[in-house]
Amino acid sequence: MIQSVRIKNFKNFKDTQIDGFTKLNIITGGNNVGKSNLLEALYCLVGKSMHPCANLTEIYDNIRKEPLKTESKNLMFYGLDTKEEIQIVITLDNNQTLDLQIKFIASEDQKVIESQIIPTAEQTQMPSQLNFTLKKNNEEIYNDHLNIAEIPNQLGYKRQFKNFDPNQLQKLLPFESAVIIPSDAAYRQVYMIQAMRKILDDNQLEKELNERLNQFDNNIQSISFNTNNQLKLKVKNIKEKLPLSAFGDGLKKYLHIVSAFMADNAKTIYIDEVENGLHFSRMKLLLRCVIDFINNNKDGNLQVFMTTHSQEFIEILDQVIREKDFAHQTKLFCLKQDDQYVIPRTYYGENLEYYFENEENLFG
């Protein structure tokens, strides 16, 4: 599990250290303080792939839907200063460290443009690059480059990394994959199709999912794929099955999150703006589910990070973690902008009720 992170020169983080992560981590703070950016920084190193280049492009190409080009590349660096390299260092619970450094390498074309000289044809064909250096316990695992260029508009296209050799990553084993669920997950049905297939191919998982859907709405009896690979739900007193699109954002968000826990072998799950689309009455249900998934994880090392800007969600969280006796494994990290720096403030789950009574500002 992730114990701590230090982020330098990444997006709005000039230099921020956050220590003491636990099993359930809630990230709060004001607008544009970096809650989502924190999840992305963690995902670069503890993500879907062992390869940070792949994790970063997953964020830009598939989650943010703003492919990594010159403008979006600049926004990755604090203050748009591409001369300073990005560094993200994560400490795991076994005291191992993962250290990622990202450096911008301007193409000759870019250098010529900045000098206001007309570039040659050869220079215009050379893309700028991001150089990735990954270290584990201060030992360099690999050094790779990612070209900053348009990606073809074709389904299933994957970026190719210049020097990627899977054998280099053996030193990162055992690798524990992660899942990131974006704030607009209700509109990303395509991202849960794979998870749903795995669940619906397993009778026991299918039964569990149907029970969880029935807890959300007791009129829902089951979910399945039709012959056109669309998700359809069987609803009480309605003859024909209804498409998932006929339901509200709350059910879609709930299904996306629950299916990620059930289907993936991920040990780290990041959920951005967890309350989006959910009625307050279903926030409690979702939190109970999340804590049950953490408690029932056979290896005991499932870790969850959630961002929220909802006071109501935090109040419900306080109720659920006390009900589930999970307060000592819950922390709230409030990010606050202080001049150039983002400063974290830690609040402990067992003291949330006390913070409320004293009208503590848990949102920066």
What are these regions (language model features)?
Residues 1-56, 238-364:
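Switch/communication elements of ASCE P-loop NTPase nucleotide-binding domains
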Residues 48-264, 268, 336-356, 361-364:
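Phosphate-coordinating catalytic segments in nucleotide- and nucleic-acid-processing enzymes
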